Amino acid sequence: MNDLVNLLDLDADALTAYCGELGEKPFRARQLQRWIHQFGASRFDAMSDLAKSLREKLATRAEIRSPAAITDNLSADGTRKWLLDVGNGNAVETVYIPEETRGTLCVSSQAGCAVNCRFCSTGKQGFSRNLTTGEIIGQLWMAEFAMREQLGRGPKDDRVISNVVMMGMGEPLLNYDAVVPAMRLMLDDNAYGLSRRRVTLSTSGVVPMMDRLSKDLPVALAVSLHASNDALRDVLVPLNKKYPLAELMAACRRYLEFAPRDFITFEYCMLDGVNDGVEHARELLKLVADVPCKFNLIPFNPFPESGLKRSNNDQIRRFAQVLMDAGIVTTIRKTRGDDIDAACGQLAGEVKDRTRLAERGKFGKITPLVPVAATGQAGEARPA
């Protein structure tokens, strides 16, 4: 059994408390945090300004460990996707998306997902477990320093990753106690120093936790809407049966009182013949009439056995035009990295399926598809 404390699990307050338990003053925690999150150090003996006595204590009591990479794939368009091992046959996905003025990392919060949206590959896997704070922030830690090795730092010695979206596998608000400390580290100037406007949490609409987040750590909010009425959303997003649209819209209005942005982003997956009619767009206008918002229309990314099809481009444009004619800012998400993956969650689902087969004796051992050595500082092997 591993009794070492993973320091990636600790935000600033928790790290200060831990150093106090070791008999160290608070400034040592700040030094340690900088080494980990600003410089990507994974070895205590590399932390040259820490007292030797502290380094020796840490070497026997603590570790810095992020999930190990099973695969690491780079698309022709610059998108980079990691499949990360979180144990017991479970894997999660992390994606870096380059754009002209920013680099965005899409982070997972759970292995699997209990919400089970009709169009989501992750939901079809079922729910395995919540990720720890260290497994969540570890995705940013791993990706930032991997991207620095690939691209170098920016012209002003900037970080490569300027934005984080909690839009990967899982429902973040159903893993609140691990997600919030991870986001605190993202915002901490002594760690990643992102602004609240540059960290976006996406939720399917867990209303009580939206209210809690608005008071604890109001970051930018995206809501997975995907339907214009309750009858349709009950089918596409089963959580709607618990928190119907009227409650969700009221929660969005309350959140805006605290939000760093003056609008909510509504995500809407475009499904051919299901939710993509002009009548659905007009119904949306009534639904969001008193919620300052923008829409992000997402072409459906097909996966096996979904039984759904992507709306064609002309239909997506017609749908978008209805919203834009009403004055709502509307974007159509570009499909990225098509040459390295399919739907979000599909690679992780393949690992889980292979694990289940192995447990039934059809495979002897689960081996990585493409073994990758993630690194911390240049030339430094990152521990598995």
Curated annotation (Swiss-Prot):
Disulfide bond sites: C106-C344
Record carries keyword S-adenosyl-L-methionine: yes
Protein location: Cytoplasm
Binding site for S-adenosyl-L-methionine: G170, E171, S202, S224, L225, H226, N301
Cofactor annotation comment: Binds 1 [4Fe-4S] cluster. The cluster is coordinated with 3 cysteines and an exchangeable S-adenosyl-L-methionine.
UniProt key word Methyltransferase: yes
Record CDD domains: Radical_SAM
EC number in record: 2.1.1.192
Keywords: 4Fe-4S, Cytoplasm, Disulfide bond, Iron, Iron-sulfur, Metal-binding, Methyltransferase, rRNA processing, S-adenosyl-L-methionine, Transferase, tRNA processing
GO terms, molecular function: 4 iron, 4 sulfur cluster binding; metal ion binding; rRNA (adenine(2503)-C2-)-methyltransferase activity; rRNA binding; tRNA (adenine(37)-C2)-methyltransferase activity; tRNA binding
Gene Ontology biological process terms, A to Z: rRNA base methylation; tRNA methylation
Membrane spanning stretches: none
Family under the similarity heading: Belongs to the radical SAM superfamily. RlmN family.
Described function: Specifically methylates position 2 of adenine 2503 in 23S rRNA and position 2 of adenine 37 in tRNAs. m2A2503 modification seems to play a crucial role in the proofreading step occurring at the peptidyl transferase center and thus would serve to optimize ribosomal fidelity.
Note: Reaction proceeds by a ping-pong mechanism involving intermediate methylation of a conserved cysteine residue.
Protein name: Dual-specificity RNA methyltransferase RlmN
Organism of provenance: Cupriavidus pinatubonensis (strain JMP 134 / LMG 1197)
